[in-house]
């Protein structure tokens, strides 16, 4: 890959579709951006170390969300308490994530690390502990659990029931360009709920395991043990439990 192509920004249409009524405040639909679609990008986690935050230090900057900063920092601390990841407010670093108030219900994050300004948009639909944790998972380099190449062994995806703008988040990736970390996790902070991104009155995903459920990330309050091990493995955290 050439330097020029690496820094080319892919213009991606992002649509975070929030359903009305009781689900109106939940994370739902398309919520991640990629600076470039390339073999560097895995679908369980980023493939190459060059796309991970150097030394596991995530540099961030707030440009809005004044009244939500304490909550966002609590989510960051939850990650730091369970992994070797640390979060540092920006001084003059070139590579950092800008955290801001997105338009209406727009929630998305640029994937992994780049040596320039990245975005983490937290609109009205993403201001819960779980939704912020989900987006920070993308910032660290985690993709959606339902995109794993082995996902069909664990869930049924109903593509016809998914809103067009969110179909990309349900695309299954191939084993030849994907490194899968750990077992499938029905409870992962990175998996969608069974009605997320749905067309009216339909289900987008069902589990194959009896007794398992799929819950919207906005209703969750922590990383699972498997989420933690995946991050620790991805960043090769010393002294931490890894796969």
From Swiss-Prot:
Which coenzymes or cofactors are required?
Answer: Zn(2+)
Q: CDD domains given for it?
A: ZnMc_astacin_like
Q: Which GO terms describe its biological process?
A: proteolysis
Species source reads Loxosceles intermedia (Brown spider)
Subunit structure of this chain's protein: Monomer.
Q: In which tissues is it expressed?
A: Expressed by the venom gland.
Q: How is its activity regulated?
A: Inhibited by 1,10-phenanthroline.
Task: Report residues binding Zn(2+).
Answer: 134, 138, 144
Source taxon at top rank: Eukaryota
Protein name stated in the entry: Astacin-like metalloprotease toxin 3
The entry's active site is: 135
Report the GO molecular function annotations.
metalloendopeptidase activity; toxin activity; zinc ion binding
Provide the alphabetized UniProt keywords.
Disulfide bond, Glycoprotein, Hydrolase, Metal-binding, Metalloprotease, Protease, Secreted, Signal, Toxin, Zinc
């Amino acid at each position: 890959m050439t330097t020029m192509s690496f820094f080319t920004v892919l213009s991606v249409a992002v649509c975070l579709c929030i359903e009305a009524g009781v689900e109106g405040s939940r994370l739902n639909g398309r919520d991640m951006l990629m600076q470039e679609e390339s073999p560097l990008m895995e679908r369980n986690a980023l493939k190459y170390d060059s796309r991970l935050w150097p030394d596991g230090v995530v540099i961030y900057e707030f440009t809005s969300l004044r009244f939500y900063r304490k909550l966002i920092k609590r989510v960051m601390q939850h990650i730091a308490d369970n992994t070797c990841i640390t979060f540092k407010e920006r001084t003059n670093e070139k590579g950092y994530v800008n955290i801001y108030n997105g338009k209406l219900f727009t929630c998305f994050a640029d994937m992994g690390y780049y040596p320039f300004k990245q975005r983490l948009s937290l609109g009205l639909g993403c201001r819960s502990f779980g939704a912020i944790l989900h987006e920070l998972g993308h910032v660290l380099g985690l993709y959606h659990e339902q995109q794993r190449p082995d996902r069909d062994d664990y869930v049924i995806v109903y593509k016809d029931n998914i809103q067009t703008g969110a179909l990309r988040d349900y695309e299954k990736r191939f084993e030849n360009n994907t490194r899968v970390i750990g077992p499938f996790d029905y409870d992962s902070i990175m998996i969608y709920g069974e009605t997320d991104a749905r067309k009216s009155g339909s289900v987008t995903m069902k589990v194959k395991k009896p007794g398992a459920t799929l819950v919207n990330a906005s209703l969750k309050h922590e990383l699972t043990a498997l989420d933690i091990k995946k991050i620790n493995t991805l960043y090769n955290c010393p002294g931490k439990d890894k796969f």
